[in-house]
A protein has these predicted regions:
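Flexible gly/pro-rich beta->alpha loop and the following alpha-helix that scaffold active-site loops
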Residues: 1-37, 43-54
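Amide-donor transfer/coupling interface in amidating biosynthetic enzymes
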Residues: 22, 26-30, 58-193
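A structural signal for short, well-ordered beta-strand segments and their strand-loop junctions
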Residues: 37-39, 146-147
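Short, glycine/serine-rich, charged loops/turns that create anion-binding
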Residues: 41-43, 151-152
């Protein structure tokens, strides 16, 4: 389990202390033709390994202020950032699920952008007490996105705790745009392997 030693620490150790895995991961992030998305445990892993920060500085996630596992439906504001995946969603507010015990961003003084913020700083709307209401970060080059909320759990309207009546004809929620944006970037950059 990736949380036994703390958020993603065991998983991170598998990369840090395995020379072959560490080299493969480092090479992946050095390439200019890659994208990555870390959701929840993936976000924790990216932060623990310093994959969002250009100087590879580790920024471990902290326990939620409530000191318990938080699971619920919240809203996030998608910020203006250089995120390839979120570029068409900038300045929108969308509902999304959270489910984590260590999802608090703190000590956010680094070389990255805040890509998503919880819509309110008050608990339970900011379920973990993250600094600056941060829900997700993106690397300066826009290609690597780390977020605690689960966008994969709100792709279909029926998955959402609330979906606007005026959009009841939607087959997919606006969150699908993150994956469409990624696909378009891959096509625009002629990435085939």
């Amino acid at each position: 389990n990736s949380d036994v030693l703390g958020s993603a620490k065991g998983w991170a150790g598998a990369f840090k202390y395995n020379q072959k895995a560490n080299k493969a991961l480092s090479n992946f992030y050095l390439r200019s033709d890659t994208l990555s998305l870390g959701v929840c445990n993936g976000c924790q892993l990216m932060m623990e390994l310093g994959l969002i920060e250009s100087n590879n500085k580790s920024i471990p996630m902290a326990h939620n202020n409530s000191q318990k596992f938080e699971s619920g439906y919240v809203t996030v504001n998608i910020q203006k950032s250089n995120s390839i995946m979120l570029k068409s969603l900038e300045n929108t507010q969308l509902g999304i699920f959270v489910a984590h015990g260590e999802g608090k961003f703190e000590n956010l003084n680094g070389d990255f952008d805040i890509a998503l913020k919880y819509s309110s700083g008050d608990y339970p709307f900011n379920p973990n007490g993250s600094e600056k209401n941060t829900a997700g970060l993106v690397s300066k080059n826009g290609r690597h996105l780390a977020m605690m909320p689960h966008l994969e759990r709100v792709i279909f309207p029926w998955q959402c705790a609330h979906y606007p009546n005026e959009r009841n004809e939607d087959e997919l929620t606006p969150w699908i745009e993150a994956f469409i944006n990624a696909l378009n970037w891959i096509k625009e950059n002629n990435i085939t392997n």
